Regions:
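Secreted/periplasmic carbohydrate-active enzymes, especially glycoside hydrolases
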Residues: 1-240
Length: 240
């Protein structure tokens, strides 16, 4: 760790994509946190546990094969695999990374598309319950759809935008809707400002997609969509 980053007030978030099943984390001998669940992502702020130069990270992962109430998919609870069950596994199985952030940053954004109303709704959550301004720009195939500034109060904001002002022809031909054959995506750029200074920026994307069921028929964007529902499954002798 570069000591200058610590001196400049940077905060450091340690992210785990997933670790099976119960995870305990220590940094430089100090406990950082515990997470239970083998498929969900999690993170810990470890700023106060870091020191300039080399740091030691210890991760302990436990998967109790005797606990039959624990979600495990098809992992076998016995020592050796048998029948259709998978080999027992434990530990980190998704990416782990360290993220430097400012004292205030965008923690999470929930995006909810409304195909029928041609709208996108967003719920924005900052790391701290403070007041800030968030600039949001939405583009589609390079065309700007939304350019707005949201006032964030108490660390949270909720906003909806209409998306059809500049895409009348596109909306008529449904080319904006996401399907497996035409995976159309809208790009989003966020810029967070506190006291007039930019403190965080992030890029994301979303799709205009609606999934529903009517009279027993699966619908994608209000139209019947046939699903093959195939399972392609294999076993590798060296592991499974």
């Amino acid at each position: 760790i570069d000591g200058r980053a610590l001196e400049q007030g940077k905060r450091f978030i340690l992210h785990f994509g997933a670790c099976d099943y119960k995870t305990e984390v220590w940094v430089n001998g100090e406990w950082a946190g515990t997470h239970v669940g083998g498929h969900s992502s999690f993170s810990f702020e470890i700023t106060d546990l870091l020191r300039d130069g080399e740091n030691v990270l210890v991760v302990r992962a436990e998967d109790d094969s005797k606990n039959l109430e624990q979600p495990r998919g098809k992992q076998f609870w016995k020592q050796e695999s048998a029948s259709i069950f998978y080999t027992r596994t434990t530990g980190i199985w998704q990416t782990v990374w360290l993220e430097p952030v400012e004292s205030q940053f965008i923690r999470q954004v929930w995006m909810t598309p409304d195909v029928d109303q041609k709208m996108i709704g967003m719920e924005i959550l900052l790391d701290q319950k403070t007041e800030a301004r968030l600039k949001v720009e939405i583009t589609y195939k390079g065309t700007r759809m939304v350019c707005d500034t949201v006032t964030v109060l108490n660390g949270k904001a909720v906003r909806e935008w209409k998306l059809d002002q500049n895409l009348n022809l596109e909306w008529e031909h449904k080319s904006y809707e996401w399907t497996p054959e035409h995976p159309a995506l809208f790009d989003v750029h966020y810029k967070l400002e506190c006291e007039g200074a930019a403190v965080d920026e992030a890029d994301s994307y979303f799709a205009m997609r609606k999934v529903s069921v009517e009279n027993g028929t699966f619908l994608l964007n209000n139209r019947p969509y046939y699903q093959k529902m195939l399972l392609d499954q294999g076993y590798w002798r060296g592991s499974l």
